Amino acid sequence: MPAAYIKSVIKTVPDYPKPGILFRDVTSILEDHKAYTTSIELLVKEFAPYNFDKVAGTEARGFLFGAPLAIELGIGFIPVRKPNKLPRKVISESYDLEYGTDCLEIHEDAVKPGEKVLMLDDLLATGGTMIATANLIRRLGGIVEHAGFVISLPDLGGEAKLQEIGVQSHSICEFEGE
């Protein structure tokens, strides 16, 4: 099963970025051509039927999966960045992380009203990053109903939080209770 192979490639780093966190290092997928290409293929298979207008990938690991997915789907890619990284006029949204707080920005002209946008990131934990991303896209008039991830940590409740704001999530693999 392709998802099982991808999960087997993901390395776990204990106590990173702080004590008590088991960090799932999705960059280990990038080192394995088969795992990386299979990840993109699985995301394409899942999301191609929805006919999205754009993929929004969150900094920075969301870029690594979101941009190739957008290319395969034949649509545009929106980089969702941390503050002061985008050159044109932006809108901003603050959010809570599993291990702190942060802010995200997108160009104010990145989404046209009515465009269907797929949000994509490497990992779903508490959902804070994706909620902030959804808020940014919706403030610009975009439609956000789906989010994709390589990894989900269901014990942290992110999927339920996304459902509360009308976003369905799909992950390639899950790490429960680990």
Swiss-Prot record:
Swiss-Prot/TrEMBL keywords: Cytoplasm, Glycosyltransferase, Purine salvage, Transferase
Cited InterPro entries: Ade_phspho_trans, PRibTrfase_dom, PRTase-like, UPRTase/APRTase
A GO cellular component annotation in the UniProt record: cytoplasm
Name of protein: Adenine phosphoribosyltransferase
Known EC number: 2.4.2.7
GO biological process, one term: purine ribonucleoside salvage
Reaction(s) catalysed by this chain's protein: AMP + diphosphate = 5-phospho-alpha-D-ribose 1-diphosphate + adenine
Pfam families assigned to the protein according to its UniProt record, in alphabetical order: Pribosyltran (PF00156)
Family per similarity comment: Belongs to the purine/pyrimidine phosphoribosyltransferase family.
SUPFAM superfamilies: PRTase-like
Sequence intervals crossing the membrane: none
The protein's assembly and partners: Homodimer.
Species, as recorded: Pseudoalteromonas atlantica (strain T6c / ATCC BAA-1087)
Major enzyme class: transferase
Known role: Catalyzes a salvage reaction resulting in the formation of AMP, that is energically less costly than de novo synthesis.
Pathway info: Purine metabolism; AMP biosynthesis via salvage pathway; AMP from adenine: step 1/1
PANTHER family: ADENINE PHOSPHORIBOSYLTRANSFERASE (PTHR32315:SF3)
Originating gene: apt
Annotated compartments: Cytoplasm
One GO MF term attached to the UniProt entry: adenine binding
